[in-house]
Amino acid sequence: MLSRMTDFWGVSFSGDDGKPKQGHEYRTLHDIFGCAEMGIILRWKDGLLHDDGDLPAVEFQDAHIEHYRNGLPHAEKHMPAIIADYGTQCEYYIDGKQVTE
């Protein structure tokens, strides 16, 4: 499994105001020593990871991307939902269910 976000699948997140997260946010992930490791962009709709048009719900600084619809990995059949290792590895999902050929 290539996803780095499995703990987020189907989980609804709220902002500091208690309302479901909306829009996008940039975060910096840190290692156990508190040093910055990598930037990540997260896109939300109604508290769930969700693509914004053609933009993936999750973009890591190292080019790892994950497409989501309503909190679950999703892309149409001809497109991978998860793209890792600079495009050399891909996984296909529809509504959170992995699709194999």
List the predicted regions and their residue ranges:
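Glycine/tyrosine- and acidic-biased, solvent-exposed loop/turn segments at the edges of beta-strands
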Residues: 1-101
